[in-house]
């Protein structure tokens, strides 16, 4: 495994990777738009993370647990039948899957949950809170809290609880208390708002394990850095598998943690295209989508400035996606920055396109991806016809689809 601490040493000499600024900004995005009562906790967290990365004992423990508990490194798998499906005379691309679905708990989320739990212990916090949409971050957080004997409270929207009943049971089985959020749209945005309110009230004893590269600084940086192991492994595995860096990286984007984990170690590699895929829901020209980068404008949500879905009066609009994990009206500030400087590209696919992709990948590869991940797979329909010969594509297979079986069963005629 690539040592996490080496990544921080390398970052010092690279303008792209030397983000965020000391003020927690990615260009104009990011920052700390929070009540004064939270500022000491954010400063404490930033210092704890900075000190931890310099502490060999912390890094060694993290890497040991990633290997023996999480099951890293995850494979880079050549999807041969999916490759054959998209090959034509003009497109001879190969498709590779970074198998984050094979992690303990079934998704990439545990990379960050584990790292932040170790930080919480380092700071002397015994109570952990988290938000969750699809339930995967909630399960990952409940899992690491069980591992370390920490009290765990998970906030989840009532609508998402209906869609993800299996993950709700898993969280409870792991000893977590699941608090139902009924305000607003009763989805991820509202669960996040409730978690922040809890943190404001209990900041002395509680650490908030935020699940995406969103929120106030230093969360976007911390979550990114714990997930960067995805891209670090992929970079090494690509060289081993086909002798070079990939041509294209592809990942779904809601808040954006799995994509940033894959993208970050490649940002300075200008030959590698970075493509994020958002949820178009019923279509980006309807009022039922979650395509924040595609259709959003600059605003402030959950303590950070970024692109978000809002009306002409600056009120945050409802997001919609068949995927609970992409059903969020904001996006991480670093994604907004990468889009602005032209380093990353972003597109969107509809619910129907994602469902069709999930079915296709399941039938061709024997891998049932999460609905979130299926959005990245669906982009192949638009991407592959535009490519030159011998293009190497790496898709972040960010999670498995067990949690989505009920939703898929009610939507697909199988």
From Swiss-Prot:
<comment type="subunit">
    <text>Tetramer of two alpha and two beta chains.</text>
</comment>
<keyword id="KW-0663">Pyridoxal phosphate</keyword>
<dbReference type="InterPro" id="IPR001926">
    <property type="entry name" value="TrpB-like_PALP"/>
</dbReference>
<dbReference type="InterPro" id="IPR006654">
    <property type="entry name" value="Trp_synth_beta"/>
</dbReference>
<dbReference type="GO" id="GO:0004834">
    <property type="term" value="F:tryptophan synthase activity"/>
</dbReference>
<feature type="modified residue" description="N6-(pyridoxal phosphate)lysine">
    <location>
        <position position="109"/>
    </location>
</feature>
<dbReference type="InterPro" id="IPR006653">
    <property type="entry name" value="Trp_synth_b_CS"/>
</dbReference>
<dbReference type="InterPro" id="IPR036052">
    <property type="entry name" value="TrpB-like_PALP_sf"/>
</dbReference>
<comment type="similarity">
    <text>Belongs to the TrpB family.</text>
</comment>
<feature type="compositionally biased region" description="Basic and acidic residues">
    <location>
        <begin position="1"/>
        <end position="12"/>
    </location>
</feature>
<comment type="function">
    <text>The beta subunit is responsible for the synthesis of L-tryptophan from indole and L-serine.</text>
</comment>
<keyword id="KW-0822">Tryptophan biosynthesis</keyword>
<keyword id="KW-0057">Aromatic amino acid biosynthesis</keyword>
<protein>
    <recommendedName>
        <fullName>Tryptophan synthase beta chain</fullName>
        <ecNumber>4.2.1.20</ecNumber>
    </recommendedName>
</protein>
<keyword id="KW-0456">Lyase</keyword>
<keyword id="KW-0028">Amino-acid biosynthesis</keyword>
<dbReference type="GO" id="GO:0005737">
    <property type="term" value="C:cytoplasm"/>
</dbReference>
<feature type="region of interest" description="Disordered">
    <location>
        <begin position="1"/>
        <end position="23"/>
    </location>
</feature>
<dbReference type="Pfam" id="PF00291">
    <property type="entry name" value="PALP"/>
</dbReference>
<dbReference type="InterPro" id="IPR023026">
    <property type="entry name" value="Trp_synth_beta/beta-like"/>
</dbReference>
<comment type="pathway">
    <text>Amino-acid biosynthesis; L-tryptophan biosynthesis; L-tryptophan from chorismate: step 5/5.</text>
</comment>
């Amino acid at each position: 495994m690539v040592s996490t601490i080496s990544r921080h040493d390398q970052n010092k000499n690279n303008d792209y990777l030397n983000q965020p600024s000391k003020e927690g900004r990615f260009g104009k995005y990011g920052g700390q738009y929070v009540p004064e009562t939270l500022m000491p906790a954010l400063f404490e967290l930033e210092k704890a993370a900075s000190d931890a990365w310099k502490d060999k004992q912390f890094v060694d423990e993290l890497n040991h647990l990633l290997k023996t508990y999480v099951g890293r490194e995850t494979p880079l798998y050549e999807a041969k039948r999916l490759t054959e499906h998209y090959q034509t005379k003009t497109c001879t691309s190969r498709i590779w899957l970074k198998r984050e679905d094979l992690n303990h708990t079934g998704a990439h989320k545990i990379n960050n949950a584990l790292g932040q739990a170790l930080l919480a212990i380092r700071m002397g916090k015994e109570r952990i809170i988290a938000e969750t949409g699809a339930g995967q971050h909630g399960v990952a957080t409940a899992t690491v809290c069980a591992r370390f004997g920490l009290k765990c409270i998970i906030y989840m929207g009532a609508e998402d609880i209906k869609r993800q009943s299996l993950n709700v049971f898993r969280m409870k089985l792991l000893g977590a208390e699941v608090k139902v959020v009924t305000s607003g749209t009763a989805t991820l945005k509202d669960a996040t708002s409730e978690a922040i309110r809890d943190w404001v009230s209990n900041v002395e004893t509680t650490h908030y394990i935020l699940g995406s590269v969103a929120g106030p600084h230093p969360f976007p940086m911390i979550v990114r850095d714990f997930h960067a192991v995805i891209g670090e492994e992929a970079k090494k595995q690509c060289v081993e598998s086909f002798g070079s860096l990939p041509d294209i990286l592809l990942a779904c984007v809601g808040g954006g943690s799995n994509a940033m984990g894959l993208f970050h170690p490649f940002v300075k590699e200008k030959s590698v295209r970075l493509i994020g895929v958002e949820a178009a829901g019923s279509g980006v020209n309807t009022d039922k989508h979650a395509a924040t980068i595609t259709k959003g404008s600059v605003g402030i949500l959950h303590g950070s400035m970024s692109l978000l879905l809002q009306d002409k009066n600056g009120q945050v609009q409802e997001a919609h996606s068949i995927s609970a994990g992409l059903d969020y009206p904001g996006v991480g500030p670093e994604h907004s920055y990468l889009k602005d400087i032209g380093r990353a590209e972003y597109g969107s696919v509809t619910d129907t396109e994602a469902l069709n992709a999930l079915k296709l990948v399941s039938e061709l590869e024997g891998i049932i991806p999460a609905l979130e991940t299926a959005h990245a797979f669906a982009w192949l329909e638009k991407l592959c016809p535009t490519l030159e010969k011998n293009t190497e594509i790496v898709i972040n297979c960010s999670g498995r689809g067990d949690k989505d079986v009920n939703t898929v069963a009610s939507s697909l005629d199988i």
